[in-house]
């Protein structure tokens, strides 16, 4: 965040502004536009960043399709808030703020893509992680420059 002169975002609008800075500025300082603003993968243990962002609009636990509020069961996938979340995510994707590799990759492919940049330095603005992962192992420090904050629910 310091490298792009940004504060920790607290709204989805602020998040988009930070992602734009990650994508359009050069936070790793190598003079090449090679940063990924947001990257994760669907199927990784709590690495599905999209799920975290959707929860900014409506609580949506993909492992439990229904919610219960005040004794009423309801499905978040048919709410206006969920539709707004999809519109927001579509906008992020259309602006190149979500990596196009997000859905079609496996965990191995994701790591290979991030660990093999031409200049040997990777920069990811936002990466997903389970809240219990409170440390970054030496393995990841070897390959990644973390300018990021971890999202958790």
Residue ranges and their predicted role:
Residues 1-153:
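Extracytoplasmic/secretory soluble proteins
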């Amino acid at each position: 965040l310091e490298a792009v002169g940004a504060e920790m975002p607290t709204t989805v609008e602020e998040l988009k502004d930070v992602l734009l800075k990650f994508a359009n500025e050069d936070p790793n300082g190598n003079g090449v536009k090679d940063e990924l603003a947001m990257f994760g993968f669907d199927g990784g243990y709590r690495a599905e960043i999209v799920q975290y962002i959707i929860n900014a609009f409506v609580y949506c636990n993909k492992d439990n399709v229904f919610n219960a509020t005040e004794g009423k069961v309801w499905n978040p996938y048919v709410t206006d808030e969920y539709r707004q979340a999809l519109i927001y995510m579509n906008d992020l994707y259309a602006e190149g703020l979500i990596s196009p590799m997000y859905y079609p990759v496996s965990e191995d492919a994701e790591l290979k893509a991030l660990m093999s940049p031409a200049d040997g330095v990777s920069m990811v603005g936002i990466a997903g992680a389970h809240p219990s992962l409170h440390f970054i192992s030496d393995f990841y420090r070897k390959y990644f420059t973390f300018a990021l904050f971890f999202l958790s629910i």
